[in-house]
Amino acid sequence: VYKRQDKDSPRYVSFEFLESSGKCFNEKISPVIVFVNESKEGIKKAISYFKKPILQFHGDESQDFCSSFNLPYIKAISMNEKDFQNKIIEFADAFAILLDSGGQKIRGGTGKTFDWKLIPKEIKNNLIIAGGLNSNNITSLIKSYKPYGVDLASGVESKPGKKDITELKHFLKIVDEI
């Protein structure tokens, strides 16, 4: 996963990094590139380095904008938004919907969970859950909601933007045993 977010984000990556990383992938691997309100030109440049990227949008992008690249995309929707259910319907063509606890100022990586009881049961898209996931709560989430995937950030980091390998291995071991 490459996070092409705002430059102040600890998870930000440059175009130069994307270009050098793109040389490591073939068409069998689909990297996910995360964008927050990036320009169409910036997205086109970022995806040009990869054969089969998946786009992940965490900003205020419209459905028309997200689908205009003719690539699979994931749309992040904050469960703190009043109209989150309408947003889920709006992005029905998305490869996946990512439900997160972020808001307008902090788009993700908050380390906070949202109330999982708010997850709509009738989502037709693949469902990815984010927000405060760690080795203490992942079993409950997966057993109760069976998401297509989970998105990790601060729950397995030793500091913002730096994954803790020991915690990540522990997390993956738990998931593997479910």
What kind of region is each of these model predictions?
Residues 6-71:
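N-terminal active-site wall of soluble small-molecule enzyme domains
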Residues 16-24, 49, 60-154, 158-178:
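Short loop-to-alpha-helix "cap/lid" segments that border enzyme active sites
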Residues 1-2:
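Short, small-residue-biased leader/transition segments that mark boundaries at the very start
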